[in-house]
């Protein structure tokens, strides 16, 4: 399975967070909303954390999103991965992928970096630049994407869990997000 921002938004809606589309419509508005409304920020962060935990507990999933690494620290059946690349290369990739000017692509990358860092810091007190929080760090400026995928697959199939080690499978998660995750992945299976 694969879960990203769009998945998180659907799950948030299923869990009763109707303001989620407005939060996710604009990157700037998303964070403005968090800083202006502390209670709403706390509620959204708590539900996002619950969704990440429920998704990880479901198993056999790749999670892509801001701060997913934070609540999944220390679990032997989880690989926290940081994929990075030099800023000029990231800007070039965004220019090509989204057909943006260099100036707009630069602004996009810088804003996204700031948002990811702010979310991890304000939600978990962590920095995504602290590479000790990751089990594997891949620089796609040096390693091509096919090799990176092979490494990730090999790492995922080589996990070592010892008896008594904490696992995502053993997490205690809230029932509402757990049911929403199961429903989402069942829906996707039917679409295949």
Where are these regions (language model features)?
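Conserved phosphate-donor/acceptor-positioning beta-strand/loop module used by diverse small-molecule
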Residues: 74-96, 102-111
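Divalent-cation
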Residues: 65
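Short, amphipathic alpha-helical "lid/cap" segments that border enzyme active or binding sites
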Residues: 45, 49, 146-149, 153
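Short loop/helix-cap segments at secondary-structure boundaries that form the rim of catalytic
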Residues: 70-76, 129-131
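N-terminal presequence-like segments and adjacent domain-start helices
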Residues: 154-179
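ATP-dependent small-molecule kinase phosphotransfer cores
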Residues: 6-60, 100
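Small-molecule kinase domains that catalyze NTP-dependent phosphoryl transfer to phosphate-bearing small molecules
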Residues: 29-30, 102-145, 173-190
């Amino acid at each position: 399975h694969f879960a990203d921002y769009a998945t998180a938004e659907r799950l948030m809606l299923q869990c009763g967070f109707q303001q989620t589309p407005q939060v996710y419509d604009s990157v700037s508005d998303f964070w403005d909303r968090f800083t202006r409304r502390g209670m709403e920020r706390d509620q959204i962060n708590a539900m996002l954390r619950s969704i990440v935990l429920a998704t990880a507990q479901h198993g056999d999933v790749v999670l892509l999103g801001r701060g997913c690494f934070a609540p999944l620290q220390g679990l032997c059946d989880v690989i926290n991965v940081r994929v990075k690349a030099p800023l000029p290369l990231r800007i070039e990739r965004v220019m090509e992928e989204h057909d943006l000017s260099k100036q707009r692509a630069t602004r996009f990358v810088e804003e996204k970096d700031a948002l990811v860092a702010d979310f991890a810091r304000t939600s978990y007190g962590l920095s995504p630049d602290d590479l000790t929080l990751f089990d594997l760090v891949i620089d796609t400026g040096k390693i091509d994407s096919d090799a990176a995928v092979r490494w990730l697959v090999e790492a995922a199939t080589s996990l070592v869990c010892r008896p008594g080690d904490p696992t995502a499978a053993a997490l205690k998660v809230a029932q509402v997000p757990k049911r929403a995750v199961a429903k989402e992945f069942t829906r996707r299976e039917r679409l295949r």
